């Protein structure tokens, strides 16, 4: 009898059920700062204590996380959504680097590659994070570059490195030794049994410190010349992308076999864009444009709006089956249609985000998972004709040939590591109404360091494909941004901020963010309950990394998933694997307008958490 009651309990809607969390909700009234490293959250707190706004604090936290190699470096990329309380609008910061001169389909194929490489100088897009940080600060912040870089510069002078990063360096030391400047920075004990720093050891990055000092020096000189705060920050930006720093990045990259030239850095610009959005049951959800995977979450919400998720019950077999298939449909479109909208052809986003198109896609969801689900044709829903109609029929054939499917023994560690690779998040909010959500990434360990700059280069070229049958919108060419997994999120309700949320984890990001959002909106969880709740991950989409594998029907569930749920999912055609955790750390801020306060949440593992006041 007890088992029957338990089964009923677990499939009931979550409403009214109290859940004990391992971490407490973070409460604040004046400001909140949440990110992937405690020291980086402290950097944000320092800026808030000096009178900075949420953008100033986010920039300081971004600088600190990049300095601490929290799955990113200064040569990586930054994506941000910012709510501006003055204009009452959400804006998007596109600081994704692009493909350098010579980075073409023919070039990579001539190197014997099926995809651009995972690591090394040929994996590098141009640095985006410095430009993204300085643009956000100049346009929406209040403080100087010197002030917001001060914590990062102190860290570069030496900080006690944490075990996670220290061990990551040690585990990747053979790859690091291939690149002389990386070896110099990362392996202070070269020749000893352990060549990486030990946990707690003071990790010094003198070259990076000097690079940051040059930016501050340039800002100071501009201010002495009666330049405005904004002009002085952009002068520093100019030095990074067109001055001596750029020259050393190019020299050091080319010395190690890379493609950068000086015009690649000089011509790259940050873009301030209109985000994409859909309305889900009265909540406007904002994501970056289709050069990210962000719209896949919006497509999933449109599809799921056609189902009564609450009545299915939180993480019931029916719920998991429905959400899994909705994600599969959205990600099949991602894999074929998404790409840099600055290049032709442009992705059919109007059709892809159409509610009518979502109804058509929702009609494909059945009681059994379809492992062969492919992209749809959104062009009729925006009054157009699909220029790649002929490729839709061959898409599934190409994927089947290139990918062997799920191995009998289940998902292996290397595959999961690739699928969930990299990234961190930065979430800030203040009493004035500014809200920032960032998912910076790129340049994770093992990274190629560009000459004597201390700047680790991105590895994001690998997210391009070389076969138009896989995605005709995402083929590499100079100046083009790859379709990346990075995906900050903001939600608005009744014209006011409702939720800022982001997560690390590669292709799993928008899957976990979707479930987190539904946990709050459909099942009435608070922000911490939603962050700690069990998620599931699909591998039916193509990985954006490495060999771009696909595992049709594969699903990872948390290892405490009840046996009757496992049994039902097996009947529905799923190939299950079970892990202690199934999500990268989610960081989020929920806005309590009834009491005028912030509620912060972060997953109950990893180093992510925050500080508030």
What are these language model-derived features?
Residues 309-441, 580:
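Internal maturation/activation junctions in enzymes
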Residues 19-42, 46, 50-235, 240-292, ...:
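Noncatalytic scaffold domains of N-terminal-nucleophile
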Residues 1-20:
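Bacterial Sec-dependent N-terminal signal peptides
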């Amino acid at each position: 009898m007890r088992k029957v009651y338990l089964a009923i309990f677990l499939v009931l809607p979550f409403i009214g059920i109290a859940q004990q969390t391992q971490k407490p909700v973070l409460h604040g009234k004046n400001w909140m700062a949440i990110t992937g490293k405690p020291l980086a959250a402290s950097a944000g707190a320092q800026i808030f204590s000096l009178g900075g706004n949420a953008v100033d604090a986010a920039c300081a936290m971004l600088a600190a996380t990049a300095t601490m190699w929290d799955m990113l470096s200064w040569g990586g990329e930054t994506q941000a959504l910012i709510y501006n309380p003055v204009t009452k609008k959400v804006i998007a910061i596109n600081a994704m680097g692009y493909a350098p001169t010579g980075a073409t389909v023919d070039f990579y194929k001539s190197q014997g590659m099926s995809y651009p490489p995972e690591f090394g100088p040929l994996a590098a897009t141009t640095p985006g994070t410095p430009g993204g940080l300085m643009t956000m600060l100049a346009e929406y912040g209040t403080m100087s570059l010197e002030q917001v870089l001060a914590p990062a510069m102190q860290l570069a002078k030496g900080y006690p490195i944490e075990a996670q990063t220290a061990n990551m360096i040690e585990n990747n030391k053979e790859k690091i030794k291939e690149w002389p400047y990386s070896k110099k920075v990362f392996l202070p004990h070269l020749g000893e049994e352990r060549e990486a720093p030990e946990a707690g050891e003071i990790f010094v990055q003198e070259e990076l410190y000097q690079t940051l000092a040059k930016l501050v020096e340039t800002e100071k000189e501009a201010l002495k010349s009666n330049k405005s705060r904004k002009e002085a920050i952009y002068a520093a930006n100019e030095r990074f992308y067109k001055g001596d720093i750029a020259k050393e990045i190019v020299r050091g990259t080319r010395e190690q076999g890379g493609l950068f030239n000086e015009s690649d850095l000089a011509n790259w610009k940050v873009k301030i864009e209109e985000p994409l959005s859909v309305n889900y049951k009265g909540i406007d959800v904002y994501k970056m444009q289709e050069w990210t995977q962000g719209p896949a979450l919006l497509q999933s919400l449109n599809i799921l709006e056609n189902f009564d998720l609450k009545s299915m019950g939180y993480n019931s077999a029916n719920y998991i089956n429905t959400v899994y298939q909705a994600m599969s449909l959205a990600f099949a479109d991602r894999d074929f249609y998404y790409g840099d909208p600055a290049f032709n052809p442009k992705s059919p986003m109007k059709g892809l985000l159409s509610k009518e198109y979502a109804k058509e896609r929702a009609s494909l969801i059945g009681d059994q998972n379809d492992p062969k689900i492919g992209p749809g044709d959104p062009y009729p829903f925006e009054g157009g004709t699909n220029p790649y109609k002929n490729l839709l029929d061959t898409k599934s054939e190409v994927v089947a040939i290139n990918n062997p499917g799920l191995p009998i023994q289940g998902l292996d560690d290397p595959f999961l590591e690739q699928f969930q690779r990299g990234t961190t998040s930065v979430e800030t909010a203040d009493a004035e109404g500014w809200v920032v959500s960032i998912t910076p990434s790129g340049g994770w360990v093992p990274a190629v360091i560009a000459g004597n700059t201390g700047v680790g280069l991105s590895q994001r070229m690998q997210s391009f494909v070389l076969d138009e049958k896989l995605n005709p919108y995402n083929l590499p060419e100079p100046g083009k941004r790859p379709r990346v997994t990075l995906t900050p999120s903001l939600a608005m309700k009744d014209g006011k901020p409702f939720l800022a949320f982001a997560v690390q984890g590669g292709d799993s990001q928008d899957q976990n963010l979707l479930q987190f959002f539904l946990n709050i909106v459909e099942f009435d969880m608070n922000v911490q309950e939603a962050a700690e709740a069990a998620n599931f991950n699909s591998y039916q989409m193509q990985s954006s990394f490495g060999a771009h594998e696909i595992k049709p029907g594969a699903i990872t569930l948390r290892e405490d998933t009840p046996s009757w749920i496992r049994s039902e999912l097996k009947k529905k055609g799923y190939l299950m694997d079970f892990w202690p955790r199934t999500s990268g750390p989610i960081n989020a801020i929920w806005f309590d307008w009834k009491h005028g306060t912030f509620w912060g949440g972060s997953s109950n593992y990893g180093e992510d958490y925050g500080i508030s006041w």
